[in-house]
UniProtKB/Swiss-Prot annotation:
InterPro entries: DNA-binding_RecF (IPR001238), DNA-binding_RecF_CS (IPR018078), P-loop_NTPase (IPR027417), RecF/RecN/SMC_N (IPR003395), RecF_2 (IPR042174). This is DNA replication and repair protein RecF. GO terms for cellular component: cytoplasm. The RecF protein is involved in DNA metabolism; it is required for DNA replication and normal SOS inducibility. RecF binds preferentially to single-stranded, linear DNA. It also seems to bind ATP. It comes from Histophilus somni (strain 2336) (Haemophilus somnus). HAMAP family: RecF. It comes from the Bacteria. ATP binds at residues 30-37. Belongs to the RecF family. Keywords: ATP-binding, Cytoplasm, DNA damage, DNA repair, DNA replication, DNA-binding, Nucleotide-binding, SOS response. Coiled coil: none annotated. It is found in: Cytoplasm. The keyword RNA-binding does not apply.
Length: 358
């Protein structure tokens, strides 16, 4: 999977840009504030229907413009797609795939599997469980065709149950939700645990490359006591849930935890080590997708040199070259990218939202 062409109109300070990309490495160089991260953000938005920096569309649309437009050409082996997305200030989103209206963001996301590595991405390790659930759910979305519908139904039922908790006074009135909720909770949890286990060896192998001085272990927690029947737990905790106004236990509390030498990674690793572990997790997941589904991820790396010494940069660059994916890398200077010497690459220079091909 690769983006061969990208047109951007009125996305932050990127007013009118039309770029053709290399299937391998694409280097984006420029000073702070030049628009490097905005270019990665636009690529990410095209594949997710949202930003990794801001949830407010008005902050992304260029000043005094009614909307932004993204249009991309995507190639995978013998297939080609044309995708477009327009976001209006009023909040409306228009999407097209090969000229036809796309109804769901998931249609775009399926076409463009992406791995994002940014300085803020350490939340995967030191943030709340929701970041690690998203990590597992991303993988399941691309591996299991049935997962998205089950996951969506589960979230819808949880919202309905939480709303009902604030209105009912007896558990009997919740049973209609809990029968289906229990079934979906077990299904989603089973898939998550199986996927986490399938990833384990790939994660351990990649961590050994980047952090050989540490023994990294992973563990999945489904969100409630494995010795408890979930239906019984929902009934047993009804009064507590009603007092809280939401469902306390369940797959919405699941976590995928990481330890280094037996201790939580967020407690003992330096920022540089955390970044290496985050890179290892993203690479392991992308390579697992390639092995299982023969699909390449697109890797987006913002501020390549941040937190990494020269040797670790070289390791990361070599691993990215080896997996054969399309890669977008930002840096302030060319010297920060000297560890990456791919055969196929393009270099772009950004200044005040304007770009040129070097």
């Amino acid at each position: 999977m690769a983006i061969s062409r990208l047109i951007i109109n009125h996305f932050r300070n990127l007013t009118a840009i039309d770029l053709e990309f290399e299937r391998g490495f694409n280097f984006i160089i420029g000073n702070n504030g030049s628009g490097k991260t905005s270019l990665l953000e636009a690529i990410f938005y095209l594949g997710h229907g949202r930003s990794f920096k801001s949830a407010v569309a008005n902050r992304i649309i260029s000043y005094q413009q009614p909307h932004f437009i993204l249009h991309g050409k995507i190639q995978e082996q013998q297939h080609q797609w044309s995708v477009g997305l327009q976001k209006q200030r009023q909040g409306n989103t228009l999407m097209k795939i090969n000229g036809e209206d796309a109804k769901k963001i998931s249609d775009l996301a399926h076409l463009l599997p992406m791995q994002l590595i940014t300085p803020e991405g350490l939340t995967l390790l030191n943030g709340g469980p929701s970041y690690r659930r998203a990590y597992l759910d991303w993988g399941l979305f691309h591996h299991n065709a049935s997962f998205y519908n089950a996951w969506s139904s589960l979230n819808r039922l949880l919202k309905q149950r939480n709303s009902a908790l604030q209105q009912v006074c007896s558990y009997e009135k919740l049973k209609i939700w809990d029968r289906e909720l229990t079934k979906l909770a077990y299904q989603v949890s089973y898939w998550r645990e199986a996927y986490a286990e399938a990833l384990r060896s790939e994660i351990e192998k990649t961590c050994q490359l980047f952090l050989p001085e540490l023994e990294i272990s992973v563990s999945f927690h489904q969100g409630w006591d494995k010795n408890m029947d979930y239906a019984d737990l929902l009934q047993q905790n009804f009064e507590r849930d009603r007092a809280l106004g939401y469902t306390f236990s369940g797959p919405q509390k699941a976590d995928f935890r990481f330890k280094a030498n037996g201790l939580p990674v967020e407690d003992i690793l330096s920022r540089g080590q955390l970044k290496l572990l985050m890179c290892a997790l993203r690479l392991a997941q992308g390579e697992h997708l390639m092995q299982q589904k023969k699909r390449h991820c697109i890797f987006l790396l913002d501020d390549f040199a941040s937190e990494l010494d020269q040797y670790k940069r070289t390791l990361l660059a070599e691993r990215l070259q080896k997996n054969g994916s399309q890669v977008f890398v930002t840096a302030i200077t060319r010297e920060q990218l000297q560890q990456i010497q791919p055969e196929k690459h393009r270099t772009f220079y950004l200044e005040n939202g304007r770009i040129k091909d070097l």
